[in-house]
Amino acid sequence: PERKIVRVPDKLKQDIKVVTHSLMNQVASNPKILHEITPRQFEELVCELFEKEGNHVELTKQTRDGGKDLIILNNSSLGDFVIYAECKKRAPKYPVNVGFVRELYGTVNADNATAGIMVTTSYFSRDARKYQEKIKSRMSLIDYSELMKRIMACK
């Protein structure tokens, strides 16, 4: 199939950022909202958070995203880094298991990205944390608690 590049007008980009920023403020004042938004809204929220932290972030398409929801371009005095992020919106009592972390790490390696970040509205299983510990220079895990700290710091 032929691929087409769609240019999003700057005004529309700004409108999207305003809505997402408003959502970030709502989550900061009422964290329960985080569990009521759609998975795509969660991805957009995390995208906005990483942008506010000083990164350039690309949100991938909703389906067949190649195992990554966000592509984070981090430019610093140490170099240029490409970081893949996967967002897992889960109910508070359902952990993200090791399989998801392995899958993201496989995508990071296959695409020769610098590192990966898994972000969730829940928490990570013991096995997921154990696995991440082995690859900690190339994989970060952000659970609900850490995510809320970061949202509060950026509001």
PLM feature spans:
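Mixed-charge (Asp/Glu-Lys/Arg
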Residues: P1-K155
